[in-house]
Amino acid sequence: MAPAAASPPEVIRAAQKDEYYRGGLRSAAGGALHSLAGARKWLEWRKEVELLSDVAYFGLTTLAGYQTLGEEYVSIIQVDPSRIHVPSSLRRGVLVTLHAVLPYLLDKALLPLEQELQADPDSGRPLQGSLGPGGRGCSGARRWMRHHTATLTEQQRRALLRAVFVLRQGLACLQRLHVAWFYIHGVFYHLAKRLTGITYLRVRSLPGEDLRARVSYRLLGVISLLHLVLSMGLQLYGFRQRQRARKEWRLHRGLSHRRASLEERAVSRNPLCTLCLEERRHPTATPCGHLFCWECITAWCSSKAECPLCREKFPPQKLIYLRHYR
């Protein structure tokens, strides 16, 4: 009797188990970097550490021809489109590249480009809210991007910014659409597996699939599609609102030039952030009273919900942004 195709619950449990172990590996690697190099280096290189952790996890399992821990947990194996042979080394390599490496490359390319397009072309400083922890260093690629975006006209910048926004949001919506489609049809859970044609077969025999669970998954897929449509509408509305606010800000920019120069001189006397060791930008207070940059402390709290100085525990929503604080 030929092995049966893996059911959607088995595929989802395998993916969740893999995500659990990948998260543990990321946390351990990030903690080691933080202990050895400090908080500033951890903030600067945490994305690269996460990438290396994912590549190591899939390199020791999928690339090596073994089951991942999640696949082993539910007893399923990967097969190529023939459903007879396991995927070749090339196909597995493409799978890991699409699943782990490509999202990192897209994020590293599109996010800095969006920040440069949002930046004031006259002063070269990004607008409020567009800074990130990794955006303070000026790498060669970032300088090249800044040089070429500076030569664009205002109309070209708006058009390119709109295209970047559509691409970033489109990729996120495509991922959500793909998951909803999986709930309905139950074949490919990850987009990378659809592109490479890799599916799952069940190794051990299990009782028949519950039809009620299958109907529930299809209903969940329909609800996910409706939620996706609503989210896309809200994101488009928010983008237009931000574009309108940015246009108004630039129209009134010249009237407040003198005030801005005075504020810049005042900012230059700001104390340092203890996380990045640079001038504190957008001061934010923790419940215990310590002050940090908004970008630094939010990035810190995304992995450790505690104060970096006194280690007092608190949820991220307790952070207090100090507007107009000097």
Curated annotation (Swiss-Prot):
Gene Ontology CC terms: peroxisomal membrane; peroxisome
InterPro entries: PEX2/10, Pex_N, Znf_RING, Znf_RING/FYVE/PHD, Znf_RING_CS
Effect in UniProt of substituting residue 290 to Q: In PBD6B; neonatal adrenoleukodystrophy; abolished E3 ubiquitin-protein ligase activity
Residues annotated as binding Zn(2+) 1: 273, 276, 293, 296
Biological-process GO terms, alphabetical: cellular response to reactive oxygen species; peroxisome organization; proteasome-mediated ubiquitin-dependent protein catabolic process; protein import into peroxisome matrix; protein import into peroxisome matrix, receptor recycling; protein import into peroxisome matrix, substrate release; protein polyubiquitination; protein quality control for misfolded or incompletely synthesized proteins
Enzyme category, top tier: transferase
Gene Ontology MF, one: zinc ion binding
Keyword terms, alphabetized: Disease variant, Membrane, Metal-binding, Peroxisome, Peroxisome biogenesis, Peroxisome biogenesis disorder, Protein transport, Transferase, Transmembrane, Transmembrane helix, Transport, Ubl conjugation pathway, Zellweger syndrome, Zinc, Zinc-finger
Binding site for Zn(2+) 2: 288, 290, 307, 310
Keyword Hydrolase in record: no
Cytoplasmic face of the membrane: 38, 123-147, 237-326
Ways its activity is controlled: The E3 ubiquitin-protein ligase activity is stimulated by PEX12.
EC numbers for this chain: 2.3.2.27
Listed pathway(s): Protein modification; protein ubiquitination
Peroxisomal matrix side: 1-7, 61-89, 186-216
Keyword Disulfide bond among UniProt keywords: no
Subunit annotation: Component of the PEX2-PEX10-PEX12 retrotranslocation channel, composed of PEX2, PEX10 and PEX12. Interacts with PEX19.
Disease: Peroxisome biogenesis disorder complementation group 7: A peroxisomal disorder arising from a failure of protein import into the peroxisomal membrane or matrix. The peroxisome biogenesis disorders (PBD group) are genetically heterogeneous with at least 14 distinct genetic groups as concluded from complementation studies. Include disorders are: Zellweger syndrome (ZWS), neonatal adrenoleukodystrophy (NALD), infantile Refsum disease (IRD), and classical rhizomelic chondrodysplasia punctata (RCDP). Peroxisome biogenesis disorder 6A: A fatal peroxisome biogenesis disorder belonging to the Zellweger disease spectrum and clinically characterized by severe neurologic dysfunction with profound psychomotor retardation, severe hypotonia and neonatal seizures, craniofacial abnormalities, liver dysfunction, and biochemically by the absence of peroxisomes. Additional features include cardiovascular and skeletal defects, renal cysts, ocular abnormalities, and hearing impairment.
PANTHER family: PEROXISOME ASSEMBLY PROTEIN 10, PEROXISOME BIOGENESIS FACTOR 10
Function: E3 ubiquitin-protein ligase component of a retrotranslocation channel required for peroxisome organization by mediating export of the PEX5 receptor from peroxisomes to the cytosol, thereby promoting PEX5 recycling. The retrotranslocation channel is composed of PEX2, PEX10 and PEX12; each subunit contributing transmembrane segments that coassemble into an open channel that specifically allows the passage of PEX5 through the peroxisomal membrane. PEX10 also regulates PEX5 recycling by acting as a E3 ubiquitin-protein ligase.
Protein's UniProt name: Peroxisome biogenesis factor 10
Species, as recorded: Homo sapiens
